[in-house]
From Swiss-Prot:
UniProt keyword annotation of Nucleotidyltransferase present: yes
GO biological process: CMP-keto-3-deoxy-D-manno-octulosonic acid biosynthetic process; lipopolysaccharide biosynthetic process
Organism: Neisseria meningitidis serogroup C (strain 053442)
Record protein name field: 3-deoxy-manno-octulosonate cytidylyltransferase
EC number: 2.7.7.38
EC supergroup of this enzyme: transferase
Position of the signal peptide: none
Family the UniProt entry places it in: Belongs to the KdsB family.
Gene Ontology terms for molecular function: 3-deoxy-manno-octulosonate cytidylyltransferase activity
Record key words, sorted: Cytoplasm, Lipopolysaccharide biosynthesis, Nucleotidyltransferase, Transferase
Pathway: Nucleotide-sugar biosynthesis; CMP-3-deoxy-D-manno-octulosonate biosynthesis; CMP-3-deoxy-D-manno-octulosonate from 3-deoxy-D-manno-octulosonate and CTP: step 1/1; Bacterial outer membrane biogenesis; lipopolysaccharide biosynthesis
Subcellular locations according to the entry: Cytoplasm
The keyword Nucleotidyltransferase is annotated on this UniProt entry: yes
Length: 253
């Protein structure tokens, strides 16, 4: 398999769950749990990119490499662009972006996302899974993605896409039988050189409207290959309820 590294963007500020990167999960901070899970993948290196010295200190205390970045980044991808430059990663090296609030992420998904980047010879790759719940389709916190015939992303949106016209007209809460509805999984793979290019691209209007960083890539004309996972991954941590659920999982391990 082609060599890759995992970079984990982790900021201390969080509107819905303040300080969640340092939230305790069965004796260890969440960011440490994420890094340990990422280390179970085939990554040659796992590095946390953070904006706060407390996170860096905690990571280093647990033997995890961490690099400081600016606290002015609007997205995890631009944070990783700064981190990859600071780490002097070669332009061809594959970087997998694992979100800092995913302590249950499957190592196999990390590996597969890196593989998809290489197999499709694209600048960026990500993942999705089939959605079967109507309420989740309508939920703006569940990002949807539609693909072309080559399994590249056409668009990502918080809106319900594809729009189920006939079902909506009839007032039915039905999922389509003609095609799968896909929910985006927040994991990305790209080469370090493309990370620098991303940071230099102008911000797209759609990226701002939807608050979805990956739309910058589509806006500038680059394809994004999408791996369809066989099952939905464990949910990340956005709320106190999410944190309680994850803590319960680790208590049983």
């Amino acid at each position: 398999m082609t060599e890759f590294v995992v970079l984990i963007p982790a900021r201390l500020d969080s509107s819905r769950l303040p300080g969640k990167a340092l939230a305790d999960i069965h004796g260890k901070p969440m960011v440490v749990r994420v890094a340990e899970q990422a280390a179970k993948s085939k990554a040659a290196r796992v590095v946390v990119a953070t904006d706060h010295p407390d996170i860096q200190t905690v990571c280093q205390a647990h033997g995890i490499e961490a690099v400081m970045t600016s606290n002015r980044h609007e997205s995890g991808t631009t944070r990783l662009a700064e981190a990859s430059a600071a780490l002097k990663l070669p332009p061809h090296l594959i970087v997998v972006n694992v979100q800092g609030d995913e302590p249950l992420i499957a190592p196999e998904l990390i590996d597969r996302t890196a593989e998809v980047l290489v197999e499709n010879n694209v600048q960026m790759a990500t993942a999705a899974h089939e959605l079967h719940d109507f309420d989740e389709l309508m939920n703006p916190n569940a990002v949807k993605v539609v693909l072309d015939k080559n399994r590249n992303a056409i668009y990502f949106s918080r809106a319900p896409i594809p729009y189920l016209r006939d079902a909506m007209r009839a007032g039915k809460r039905e999922m389509p039988s003609e095609t799968a509805v896909l929910r985006h999984i927040g994991i990305y793979a790209y080469r370090a050189g493309f990370l620098q290019r991303y940071a230099e691209m102008s911000v797209s209007p759609l990226e701002t409207i939807e608050s979805l960083e990956q739309l910058r890539v589509l806006w500038h004309g680059y394809p994004i290959a999408v791996e369809t996972a066989k099952e939905a991954p464990a949910a990340g941590v956005d709320t106190q309820e999410d944190l309680d659920r994850v803590r319960a999982v680790f208590q049983t391990v």
